[in-house]
Amino acid sequence: MNIDAVVEFTKKHLKDEKTGHDFYHGQRVANLASKMYLEDHPDAHADSRMVAIIKSGGYLHDTIDEKVCDNPDKVIAEIKELLPEVGFTDLEVWDILFTIQHMSFSANIEHHYHLPLSGQYVQDADRLESLGAMGIARAFTYGGK
């Protein structure tokens, strides 16, 4: 499955992002999440539907973040139109949307959401991305805003 349209959508929506929640963060999350999935599932193929779901969630997860998006509902509606055009089924669209709407730390403070397997990989990759040198750089950038 080709997710180039998802990548371009993310580039468009995060092009002016300066807090560390930019396209390159989404790309790192997408790549790390899919790498972890493939390491856990050695029989899976890099071009599998599950990898496409995981990568799409990784790319899209900050496009609806209120820190960087003025109108998350509008972007969610755009994503709902985009994903079927790419070839995702209704269930796959639901998995991706549920993940990006419920994976953040703040979304889980009062209620812990159980993400689909694909979302668990995206959430883990996003949290790992917040650690180390990149996480420190992003914290200084966002904290200075």
Positions of predicted regions on the chain:
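Short alpha-helical hairpin
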Residues: 1-11
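His-Asp-centered metal-binding catalytic motifs of divalent-metal-dependent phosphohydrolases/nucleases
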Residues: 47-67, 75, 97-106
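Post-HEXXH active-site segment of zinc metalloproteases
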Residues: 72-82
